[in-house]
Amino acid sequence: MQKFTFFVSCAKGIELLLKDELERLGISSQEKLAGVEFEGSIKDAYKVCIYSYLASQVMLKVATDKVINQQDLYEFISSINWMDYFAVDKTFKIIISGKHYDFNNTMFVSQKTKDAIVDQFRNVINQRPNIDTENPDNVIKLHLHKQFVNVFLCLNIDSLHKRSYRQFQGQAPLKESLAAAILIKAGWLEELKKHQPILIDPMCGSGTILIEAALMAKNIAPVLLNKEFKIFNSKFHNQELWDNLLEIAKNSQKVTNAIICGFDIDNNVLDKAQRNIYQAGVEDVVTVKRQDIRDLENEFESEGLIVTNPPYGERLYGDQLDELLDIFNGFGDRLSQDFYGWKVAVLTSFADSIKEMQLRTTERNKFYNGAIETILYQFKINEHAKFKHETQLEKNIRIAEASAQKSDEHIDFANKLKKNLKSLKPWLKQTGLECYRLYDADIPTFAVAVDVYSEHIFLQEYRADATIDQNIAKQRFYQAIYQIHKTLDIKYENIHTRVRQRQKGKEQYQKENDKNKFHIINEFDAKFYVNFDDYLDTGIFLDHRKIRQLVAKAAKNKTLLNLFSYTCTASVHAALKGAKTTSVDMSNTYLEWGKNNFTLNNIDAKKHSFIQADCISWLKTNKDKFDVIFLDPPTFSNSKRMDDILDIQRDHELLINLAMDSLKKDGILYFSNNYRRFKMSPQILEKFNCENIDKICLSRDFLSNKNIHNCWEIKYK
């Protein structure tokens, strides 16, 4: 039987797997870049076309030569006796791959090749074969490399990776040949030797991995699924041999007891997978159902293999990146808890997702899904697989340290911290303050507020604009954590973080966490409990420092009504100056916190009033009069404890009028709010003596944010 040289192409990264596959077919080959080469018969080449799960193209090598100009190219192509390869009545097309030093235009190479072939036929028999780019009888491929041109005749007209079963696919489809490659690399062929092989794809998408696994389990030759497969129509083609080999392949299929299961959280994707499974004819082996990967359970009697190709991070998830990472964290937990003894393989281009699994890899291999470089991470689930449990603090430190290596942007942030601290030092020394704002989005790219509480930092991230890449914003936030630790010499565990955004309803009063860890801070002659972790705010508003002093001074040895009193810090300052205070707030939690603040300052809380109530409703029924009132409402609130929604711009006139009804004629109302676009009601300005005291209430550490609050002193005329 006549021997030829064949080149079998494949995706980069699977050459060795393809070489092994050909060995199983009885064909010895040599590994090349993006393929293998072997000496063999047409029958050998047909077997590759029929049985290979990994090959893309099987090509008969025609000729190779060095070519340095267009005339060389024409003469080289003309030197090949094309009439030995196909008849004049057979159509052909030309495809070009690779790069040549002297030819930048592949269209030119294709045209010159076509001219040489057509001219040869015309010169010899006065007829010419026709070009057909859609459905040719033969495909001639030229691969360019440096100054060499390699000419091949393709046995398969379309790529072998096309199986025809995939009529429905998701956003990032995995090539069938690559799915087969990762299954083989992960050990599916060895698994098939077991009494009952088991394979799970917990993020199965449109089902490609499941179907390829089933084809191998049932020994279905891939070419049998390709309804549009077309073998070349060359003079070397042997139709009888081809038909006989196809018949052998059909008769080689077998029944399997393999268990192949797929899961996905998306019902639409599962519907596509189910239709593809039926199209491939493997519905007797493959089952799919809806399930979150974080709820994956081991319902099997023996160990098996888990292979999956999850969505590629930012490419599909975008600003849902945190959700993706959480999914992988949960996946890693399920594997270590419930799949002891199993082997796992995950193909992804997104390394951060693998880190979240917190499992030790046993092997890593590079593959390409088209142009996308991916890594196949393999794991063996045993007592050595799981990394030590990573606490949230350890995770934050790891991400912060890694983020600092990704760019140098944070250097400017560090320099700004140093500059601000140097500027504030004389004032801090003069006042004796240990709690202050050090930084407030001074650099637009680092939109955070840094509040110093002695040896602790409260780091607040302002919600990034929708136009800002959420992943970049997250990276900068962690870079800020890194620089606070490094520049200010603050322990990582003393850096407490929060994202600032509008709170709705009961969220304003709900706990963020449940650590119940309180710290004591000093403000002038008062002490306060603060909590950095459990609530949205710490328990004290640093920007209200000056207005607390004004209120306390005005209320000395008098009566004070503190409305929306929060943790009663203003009441404490006033009580220390001899005031009798009444604090009103909707939250019993904060009122209890306020009582503890009184006790901390050796003030008998029983001699003061703490009232849990909606301030508006309470004011409407209050009959007492006060010397000083401090009214500091939120900008917006729709708590279920309130009779109505509070909107400070809309409702401040009502609030002030009600508060003034509880004020003595010679008393003072201090009104404050944080709504940046606040406009005082003309009716209030007309009715009372109103003085804006924003500048008086602005502390040295808040000068860069002059609109942080609106403060008014209001008296009767």
UniProtKB/Swiss-Prot annotation:
The gene is rlmL. The keyword Glycoprotein does not apply. Belongs to the methyltransferase superfamily. RlmKL family. It holds the Pfam family THUMP. It comes from Francisella tularensis subsp. holarctica (strain LVS). It is found in: Cytoplasm. This is Ribosomal RNA large subunit methyltransferase K/L. Residues 44-155 form the THUMP domain. It catalyses: guanosine(2445) in 23S rRNA + S-adenosyl-L-methionine = N(2)-methylguanosine(2445) in 23S rRNA + S-adenosyl-L-homocysteine + H(+); guanosine(2069) in 23S rRNA + S-adenosyl-L-methionine = N(2)-methylguanosine(2069) in 23S rRNA + S-adenosyl-L-homocysteine + H(+).
